């Protein structure tokens, strides 16, 4: 089996903050699923080739929003591959059957996403094939949470709190892509957890901006937002989130 060359070797760590020279906006942009740093230590765990692995990416979304710092808003970029660690999941959203030993304190329950192979440590690639031929060491799951997940969310939280301190409110723009077939007739899907994660004014302003550019926009269907939108979207606390 032929492996492609690592398309984006990272020289600056698994999570990168692109900070503006001067913060001029309450917005914080995040690109959680466009990471393409397929390091040798991660590739060693799977038998799938790089082409199959990369199908799980929201490819190059980070480049679409790369100008955010120039407009006064930070961009948090995950460079680790989503197929090995998904930051848009709760940290305990694990399928216990994937690992060589039980997690301490685990309740035995499993979310629908983890059961489908798409927990914080995914079991399946985008084409439905298993990523692993044997159970993973639980220590490897913890390593990924420590090295990838924790730094990502630490930076997102810090930037949102900094924006709130400056402007009285902060708005996380959680940036993703989608298959063309998943929302027929729509170019843009805005997710606000059905009104729970941001104010009506914020989503209305985003929708109007896209429509002025000629895009067809729908709300929440089929993507209302997952862990990130739900976790950070606290309008009553001055922190909002829009996917």
Predicted ranges, named:
Residues 2-172, 177-243:
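N-terminal catalytic or cofactor-binding beta/alpha core of small enzyme domains
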């Amino acid at each position: 089996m032929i492996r492609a060359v690592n398309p984006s070797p990272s020289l600056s760590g698994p999570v990168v903050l692109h900070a503006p020279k001067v913060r001029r906006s309450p917005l914080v942009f995040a690109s959680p699923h466009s990471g393409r740093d397929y390091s040798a230590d991660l590739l060693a765990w799977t038998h799938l080739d790089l082409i199959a692995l990369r199908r799980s990416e929201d490819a190059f979304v980070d480049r679409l929003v790369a100008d955010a710092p120039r407009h006064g808003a930070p961009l948090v970029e995950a460079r680790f591959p989503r197929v090995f660690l998904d930051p848009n999941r709760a940290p305990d959203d694990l399928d216990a059957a994937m690992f060589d030993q039980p997690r301490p304190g685990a309740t035995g329950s499993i979310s629908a996403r983890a059961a489908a192979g798409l927990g914080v440590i995914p079991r399946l690639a985008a084409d439905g094939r298993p990523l692993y031929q044997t159970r993973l060491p639980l220590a490897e799951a913890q390593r990924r949470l420590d090295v990838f997940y924790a730094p990502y969310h630490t930076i997102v939280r810090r930037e949102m709190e900094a924006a709130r301190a400056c402007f009285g409110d902060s708005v996380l723009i959680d940036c993703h892509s989608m298959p063309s077939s998943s929302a027929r007739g729509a170019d843009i899907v805005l997710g606000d957890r059905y009104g729970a994660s941001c104010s009506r004014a914020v989503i209305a302003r985003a929708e109007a901006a896209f429509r002025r550019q000629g895009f067809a926009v729908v709300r929440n269907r089929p993507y209302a937002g997952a862990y990130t939108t739900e976790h950070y979207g606290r309008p009553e606390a001055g922190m909002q989130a829009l996917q």
